[in-house]
Amino acid sequence: MSATLALTEQLIARASVTPDDQHCQQIMTERLAALGFECETIASHGVTNLWAVKRGTDGRDGKLLAFAGHTDVVPTGPLEQWTSPPFIPAHRDGKLYGRGAADMKTSLAAFVVASEEFVAVHPDHRGTIAFLITSDEEGPATDGTVKVVELLQARGERLDYCIVGEPTSTAELGDVVKNGRRGSMSGELVVKGVQGHIAYPHLAKNPIHLLAPALAELAAEQWDAGNEYFPPTTWQVSNLHAGTGATNVTPGHADLLFNFRFSTASTVEGLQARVHAILDKHGLEYTLKWSVSGLPFLTPRGELSGALEHAIRTETGITTELSTTGGTSDGRFIARICPQVIEFGPPNGSIHKIDEHIEVRFVDPLKNVYRRVLEQLIA
């Protein structure tokens, strides 16, 4: 069994459901410390974070390449639906099964073993290798990567490149990498009306009827046209509720939850202003609470994307696609202190599902790609 596969199985065997790390980071720390990494555990409200650094011969003047990821996994769902226990690694039909196999314990193992192989061949490497690992990515993400980033900002730590081990591939390893992500902003809208008897609408104000024209306009609005890297911004309703449950009472208020997924072609302030303008135009009496869970980030083609594309092509023969589709990731936090952030990991077809798995044939090539990037950028 390869070293990467063995470490992957060791990590899968830990039931590290958010935010419980279950000593996964301790396993990684022991391996990294043996290589000469300075390892720091940063705990916050039950979340375990790891910042590990191995300086190169150029010291703080050298380039720093960070591997970022998460040890936490999503809940298993109904255990009886799993073909084999989710935290007992199992091999069937050329696949390794277990919760976290694809998202993202194989990537973590590949990071570690790639670093071990790189240091063995390049003991006097010039640049710096770092690990930024959290147990709070699948959950609220309030005490994980963002806390480490804030600490590094306070220390004046500079990251030049970061690879986030998210499962970005689709059919084959390396067919898709993410060089950016859209931002996410949600709104909680309450439109006020006057509750009344449904037979006497002139004595009431039905907030559903009041909201409907504005809702239609919001749904039809083209917020932007996107750009070279991002599709157009989208606005979607996730929840709409009003009424008491009775058939003869008009509601006193209508509650609407909505979400923007927005590109670098729009700003938070601009989108908020346009929503308020539409609501005000329709004369609504309302309250609106905003929450921004992530700003868009983008890494244009450059040193990191070039090194990763070359490593993937050399290892797999595949020409990769740069993409910004999908949801948010911890890359949105890391982009605050790192100009080049790219996500790359194994195929994502089984993530968060019953019988999550990874094809064993992808495990060592993933490690090899990570090692090749180290060789290109910091050797």
Curated annotation (Swiss-Prot):
Keywords: Amino-acid biosynthesis, Cobalt, Diaminopimelate biosynthesis, Hydrolase, Lysine biosynthesis, Metal-binding, Zinc
Keyword Endoplasmic reticulum annotated: no
Cysteines joined through disulfide linkages: none
Chain sites annotated for binding Zn(2+) 2: D103, E138, H352
Cofactor mode of binding and number, as noted: Binds 2 Zn(2+) or Co(2+) ions per subunit.
SUPFAM superfamilies: Bacterial exopeptidase dimerisation domain, Zn-dependent exopeptidases
Pathway note: Amino-acid biosynthesis; L-lysine biosynthesis via DAP pathway; LL-2,6-diaminopimelate from (S)-tetrahydrodipicolinate (succinylase route): step 3/3
PROSITE patterns reported in the protein's UniProt record: ARGE_DAPE_CPG2_1
Residues that hold Zn(2+) 1 according to the record: H70, D103, E166
Pfam families named among the record's database cross-references: M20_dimer (PF07687), Peptidase_M20 (PF01546)
Catalytic activity: N-succinyl-(2S,6S)-2,6-diaminopimelate + H2O = (2S,6S)-2,6-diaminopimelate + succinate
Cofactor(s) listed: Zn(2+); Co(2+)
EC number(s) reported in the record: 3.5.1.18
Molecular functions (GO terms): acetylornithine deacetylase activity; cobalt ion binding; succinyl-diaminopimelate desuccinylase activity; zinc ion binding
Active site residues per record: D72, E137 (proton acceptor)
Regions that span the bilayer: none
Keyword Glycoprotein: no
One of the GO biological process terms: L-arginine biosynthetic process
Quaternary structure (record): Homodimer.
HAMAP family: DapE (MF_01690)
Family: Belongs to the peptidase M20A family. DapE subfamily.
Summary of the function given for this chain in its UniProt record: Catalyzes the hydrolysis of N-succinyl-L,L-diaminopimelic acid (SDAP), forming succinate and LL-2,6-diaminopimelate (DAP), an intermediate involved in the bacterial biosynthesis of lysine and meso-diaminopimelic acid, an essential component of bacterial cell walls.
Protein name: Succinyl-diaminopimelate desuccinylase
Species this chain originates from: Burkholderia orbicola (strain MC0-3)
